[in-house]
Amino acid sequence: VWFDRDVLRLNYDGRGEELGEFQSEDQILVVQPNGDFYVTNFDLSNHYESDILIIEKFQPQKVWTAVLYDADQKYCYLKRFQLEASGRKQNFLGENPKSYLLLLTDEAYPRIAVRFGGVDAFREGLEIDAETFVGVKGFKARGKRVSNYLVEAVEELEPVRFATPSEPVAPSTAEEPEEPEATDEAQSDADLLDEITGQMKLFDK
């Protein structure tokens, strides 16, 4: 099955992006830039919207890693999750329409570079190993705060670890308590000293 972005339809003729071989029970995953996602069958009569970020054969065990700006909390968060097979649109960014996606990857062991900006531009950036930074939760979970500082940009780095076919990633089933507002495990010792001496200020986006 192929997807032709020019006409926003599927075909069996090799036009556009190859989505793979499909059996009768297989489905297609569609992810949009605003965090909406849904699945469809692979009927050639399907017509898709133009604002598609990802379209691919749905793999229910695939783990996604997202970095997003949470408009409710006014901080950037990193979350890892699996998507559900639903024909109706669901959203992994939350209910606030002002939240937005900064990065989405299906790399098994992604590394994320974080650069600070504004009044925090002088601070050294972070390099986050997403797999050890936060566990796999449901797509509605908030995730873990990247930093208390003003994040200007995030970038996916080349991975240094790779998954093997015999190495599935199991989601955590334990409930994760809400993190304390002052906690930031990604801070350096110097940043913690700033907090202790009262020199650090928090800035909303």
Could you say what each language-model-derived stretch is?
Residues V1-K205:
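C-terminal interaction appendages of subunits in large macromolecular complexes
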